[in-house]
Amino acid sequence: MTIDIYIMMGLPGSGKTTYCETHAKNKENIVEYLGQPLNLELKEEIYIDGLILTNKTLMRLIYEEIEPLKDYFSLEDINIKLHIVYFKENRKQCLVNDEYRMLQGKRTMNAEYSIKMMKFEYPDLSLFEDYDVELIKKDIYNCHLT
């Protein structure tokens, strides 16, 4: 069995949640990562949506949450394929998108400070040589304020 795990990596307002909602086969396959244990279930596809901005956070997610899947389900022949969905850095558009989702009532707290100030790194795939890893580069989603 192959498990395709899609990990969103991008600034607030880049389109991570929109990507998950438009690509996952069903919403039960989308898991929100807040830096706490995920308790992942065995599914053919998993979309991990969260604020993953650095290689350190990405490594912690993979080695603390995904790696245990191999041990936990050791009775089955499991192949884990990682898809890191990287939203290119465009802080200006992220600010527009954040304002848009605030106006639409999709968020109750704006992310302006995080968008402007947080460190954002390009994923270093050499850190995950034990995995079959694909990097998917995406332009950020564009909301238009009217």
Predicted regions: what they are:
Residues 5-7:
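Short hydrophobic/aromatic beta-strand immediately N-terminal to the Walker A/P-loop
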Residues 51-107:
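ATP-dependent NMP and nucleoside kinases share a basic, alpha-helical "lid"
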Residues 27-32, 47, 82-84, 130-142:
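Conserved beta-strand scaffold positions in the cores of enzyme catalytic domains, especially
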Residues 9, 18-65:
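Conserved substrate/cofactor phosphate-moiety recognition/catalytic segment
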Residues 9, 89-146:
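Conserved GTP-binding G-domain of TRAFAC-class P-loop NTPases and closely related GTPase folds
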Residues 33, 37-39, 68, 74, ...:
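Acidic/proline-rich low-complexity IDRs
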Residues 14:
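ATP-binding Walker
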Residues 1-3:
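Phosphate-binding P-loop
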